[in-house]
Amino acid sequence: MSTRSKSVPVPAGGGAATVPLAVLLRREVVSEKTAAERPELQVGLFSQAKKGEDYTFLKPDCERLPGVPSSSFSAFGLFDGHNGNGAAIYTKENLLSNILTAIPADLNREDWLAALPRAMVAAFVKTDKDFQTKARSSGTTVTFVIIDGLFITVASVGDSRCVLEAEGSIYHLSADHRFDASKEEVDRVTESGGDVGRLNVVGGAEIGPLRCWPGGLCLSRSIGDQDVGQFIVPVPYVKQVKLSTAGGRLIISSDGVWDVLTAEVAFNCSRTLPPEAAAEQIVKEAVQQKGLRDDTTCIVVDILPDKANLTMPHTKKQPGMGVFKNMFRKKTPSDSSSHTDREYMDPDIVEEIFEDGCAFLSKRLDSEYPVRNMFKLFICAICQVELKPSQGISVHEDSSQPGNLRRWDGPFLCQGCQEKKEAMEGKRRSRDSSSRNSGSSE
């Protein structure tokens, strides 16, 4: 079974947002660049189903403020379910709403972009917490992408991945949360009470990938999977980048693609094709090499700021050419975090704005992150319920971190979210490990 969506031009921007005085004074100088930062998107989807547990979310015309075109953005998600489709469907239907709820509605565009990484962490945890009240056995990977102008923010758990090609170079915007890919994640789970190892067979031999027992899940992070253990956390890896005015192409695919194709092969086999045909070609290339052993899904998004040229540039630069021009620039502490300064960076590089993959919730919600006033004093930072003055529990309640963190510093959690945080950190072990001779979840 295959599914497709038409590749149609979609505007991904709106009217001008409020800008600082410094930008207004230089508007004449940068008018061309400002126009180029309202990109056009072309989107393609192709999927071949084996179990019917892959779900996608394509919404190119979102508005964070309903009825305000200047607040427009686009959102795309891929949810690769396992042990049933419940977690994938629930996450698809609720994640974006939870992200928007976690960000104050009155933020300007600059602060909205700065708040997104932390809001996505809160939304992933809330979605997981809410779903686990409804089901125990289902789980899902999540790769969720928000595009606002030339800014791309990606949050991911599991092994579905998002890769960017821009300016002739390839950038990985998500993490692989399989145990085989990270000793750090193996150590975290075992220290929290999980048993990580390979499947035992008759004679004592161990086969297959590293898995967490009980349950046999090969992922250290997902949404759902309550039956495996709370140390399988929904805290996402988040990366935010800003494209140059040349635009780029995103490939978002499930492991059915990445288990067979490298990012280079995926881009090479589809470079001359529009998004719909590119997504189909990538899936068919993967299936042809390995057969249809799993649901195999691909989303391709072309970001085209130059409306005079609706075709992606297809000439890949030769290695060694333009090394500094094509470097993946990461902001340093000396760089201003203001949107004003970001507007005037070298336009020929992909700039890394934010990256964090820590699995510990207290660190991901830390008050040192941008937008210090994002979390209100009497609102739970995760589920957004109102708290009485005596009810809030600081995320630093049990912190042993050095510095000026104090137990009465925010952000604050309600009792239920505090218990969720403790469980994810291994402070509330709900079950003992069981034998590795059982079946596996994924």
UniProtKB/Swiss-Prot annotation:
SUPFAM superfamilies: PP2C-like. Mn(2+) 2 binds at residues 80, 255, 294. InterPro entries: PP2C, PPM-type-like_dom_sf, PPM-type_phosphatase-like_dom. Its EC number is 3.1.3.16. Disulfide bonds: none annotated. Residues 420-442 are annotated as: Disordered. GO terms for molecular function: metal ion binding; protein serine/threonine phosphatase activity. GO terms for biological process: regulation of intracellular signal transduction. The keyword Hydrolase applies. It catalyses: O-phospho-L-seryl-[protein] + H2O = L-seryl-[protein] + phosphate; O-phospho-L-threonyl-[protein] + H2O = L-threonyl-[protein] + phosphate. Its cofactor is Mg(2+); Mn(2+). Residues 35-303 form the PPM-type phosphatase domain. Residues 420-434 have a biased composition (Basic and acidic residues). Keywords: Hydrolase, Magnesium, Manganese, Metal-binding, Protein phosphatase. The keyword Metal-binding applies. Pfam families: PP2C. Mn(2+) 1 binds at residues 80-81. Binds 2 magnesium or manganese ions per subunit. Belongs to the PP2C family. PANTHER family: PROTEIN PHOSPHATASE. This is Probable protein phosphatase 2C 15. It comes from Oryza sativa subsp. japonica (Rice).
